[in-house]
């Protein structure tokens, strides 16, 4: 049996969420045994002050990834200082599409160097990439030294597909972990993504997924 809860990065990234809602979100995620919560930089200090077991993840350059490198670095450093243990970094998709691969790698390396204690996940936005670009994205993330390649911000025109997760997994050959994100809203989809090779699941439906898992397995 796959304990889906241990794969979930439960996201609370909508701009209208109040601090009270973030607090309740963190407490509920922890109560359900969810692995991590993922929040915006403004909410990291609050989430970290509440979290006891659940990991705290922060998005960087979210959701477009087109901030200047210096801004991303500062954002990442401050997030870790505020208590973030993991960083989900949106890479510069425009630079990648422009084949400025050295720039993409160096930007990521600079962020990683300044936040050595963090787990680094790079969001590459697979819904905008073809098969060859996805393979290239895997190699760039590995070269930069990322811990995970993450499929999507969830802000793309569609969600992540099982085929994309399988392609990343087969291309990675065990050299980098995979976080599937985008359109994962129920337990069945989460399980399918894990079976396809996802090591982590990014979703804003983590609470309902965890509750359904517990209901089915009477834990």
From Swiss-Prot:
Keyword Disulfide bond attached: no
GO molecular function, a single term: deoxyribose-phosphate aldolase activity
GO BP term, pick one: 2-deoxyribose 1-phosphate catabolic process
Entry annotation: catalytic residues: 88 (proton donor/acceptor), 150 (schiff-base intermediate with acetaldehyde), 179 (proton donor/acceptor)
Keywords: Cytoplasm, Lyase, Schiff base
Transmembrane segments: none
Keyword Nucleotide-binding on entry: no
Cell compartment(s), UniProt: Cytoplasm
Class of the enzyme per the UniProt entry, highest EC level: lyase
Gene Ontology, cellular component aspect: cytoplasm
Main location: cytoplasm
Domain of life: Bacteria
Pathway(s) this gene product operates in, as recorded in its UniProt entry: Carbohydrate degradation; 2-deoxy-D-ribose 1-phosphate degradation; D-glyceraldehyde 3-phosphate and acetaldehyde from 2-deoxy-alpha-D-ribose 1-phosphate: step 2/2
E.C. numbers: 4.1.2.4
Enzymatic reactions: 2-deoxy-D-ribose 5-phosphate = D-glyceraldehyde 3-phosphate + acetaldehyde
InterPro entries given in the database record: Aldolase_TIM, DeoC, DeoC/FbaB/LacD_aldolase, DeoC_typeI
HAMAP family: DeoC_type1
UniProt family annotation: Belongs to the DeoC/FbaB aldolase family. DeoC type 1 subfamily.
Function noted in UniProt: Catalyzes a reversible aldol reaction between acetaldehyde and D-glyceraldehyde 3-phosphate to generate 2-deoxy-D-ribose 5-phosphate.
Protein name: Deoxyribose-phosphate aldolase
Organism, scientific name: Aquifex aeolicus (strain VF5)
């Amino acid at each position: 049996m796959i304990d889906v809860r241990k794969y979930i990065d439960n996201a609370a990234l909508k701009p209208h969420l109040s601090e009270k809602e973030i607090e309740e979100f963190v407490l509920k995620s922890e109560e359900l045994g969810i692995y991590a919560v993922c929040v915006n930089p403004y909410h990291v200090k609050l989430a970290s002050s509440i979290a006891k077991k659940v990991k705290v993840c922060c998005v960087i350059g979210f959701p477009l990834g087109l901030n200047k490198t210096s801004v991303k670095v500062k954002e990442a450093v401050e997030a870790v200082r505020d208590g973030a243990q993991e960083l989900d970094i949106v890479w510069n998709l425009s630079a990648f599409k422009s084949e400025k691969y050295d720039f993409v790698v160096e930007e990521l390396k600079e962020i990683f160097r300044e936040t050595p204690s963090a787990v680094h996940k790079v969001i590459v936005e697979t819904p905008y990439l073809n098969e060859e670009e996805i393979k290239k994205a895997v190699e760039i993330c590995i070269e930069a030294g990322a811990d995970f390649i993450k499929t999507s911000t969830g802000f793309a025109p569609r969600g992540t597909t099982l085929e994309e997760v399988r392609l990343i997994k087969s291309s990675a050959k065990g050299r980098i972990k995979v976080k599937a994100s985008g359109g994962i809203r129920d337990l069945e989809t989460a399980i399918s993504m894990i079976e396809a090779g996802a090591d982590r699941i990014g979703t804003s439906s983590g609470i309902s997924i965890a509750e359904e898992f517990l209901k089915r397995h009477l834990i």
